[in-house]
Amino acid sequence: MSFTNLYQEIREEWKSLKKSEIYDVEKSRMIGWRHGPSVVRLDHPTRIDRARALGYKSKDGFIVVRSRVRRGGSNREKIMGGRRPRRLAYNKLTRKKSLKLIAEERAADKYPNLEVLNSYYVGEDGLYKYYEVILVDKSHPNIYNDPHISWISEPQNTGRVYRGLTSAGYKVRGLRTGRKGSSKSRPSIRANGRLRR
């Protein structure tokens, strides 16, 4: 069996996870993940097909971490000052960032010398969602000498996850769609508002 066929089979298993044979294994894994640390470095990706598709290579300079994020909307600290009840909102607030982007940022906080390349979903339970984040050491010789990934070593890509330059960041900023219907998303939501003043 070729690697292409193997990756395709893995991908098909993950598409219908609850019906597949690996579902029981995945459930037992998540019990351990739930009680462990929120950001954990892994020896190898859980979903090798997805990791390879997003640019991961099994060589020095690449690492994979699993990041855990609480599901649902966000809460903010309860407001103690007086105001109209409708202005008191402190729970059931919709996040402006996706859970995937939050997971990437937390992984970048844990490893400040690495850059986030991409991330992918690996599971969820009643309380958390789990993502695996691919991180790259941009100062490693394997990285800056590799023509496919050396672009991440350039200075303009420093801290890319915090500036919404990863795939999850682009989606949150509304830059996945074409020009029609998303005219207020470019050059950015904030800059567009300033231009229209």
Swiss-Prot record:
Among SMART domains, the record links this protein to:
Ribosomal_L15e
Taken from the UniProt entry, a GO cellular component term is: cytosolic large ribosomal subunit
Q: Does the keyword Membrane apply?
A: no
SUPFAM superfamilies in the cross-refs: Ribosomal proteins S24e, L23 and L15e
Q: Which Pfam families match?
A: Ribosomal_L15e
Q: Name one GO molecular function term.
A: RNA binding
An example GO biological process term is: cytoplasmic translation
Keyword annotations of the record: Ribonucleoprotein, Ribosomal protein
**Cross-referenced InterPro entries, in alphabetical order?**
Rbsml_eL15_core_dom_sf (IPR024794), Ribosomal_eL15 (IPR000439), Ribosomal_eL15_arc (IPR020926), Ribosomal_eL15_CS (IPR020925), Ribosomal_uL23/eL15/eS24_sf (IPR012678)
Q: Where is this region: Disordered?
A: 175-197
Q: Which PANTHER family match?
A: LARGE RIBOSOMAL SUBUNIT PROTEIN EL15, RIBOSOMAL PROTEIN L15
List, alphabetically, the HAMAP family matched.
Answer: Ribosomal_eL15
Entry similarity comment? Belongs to the eukaryotic ribosomal protein eL15 family.
What protein does this entry describe? Large ribosomal subunit protein eL15
High-level lineage? Archaea, Methanobacteriati, Thermoplasmatota, Thermoplasmata, Thermoplasmatales
Task: Tell me what gene encodes this.
Answer: rpl15e
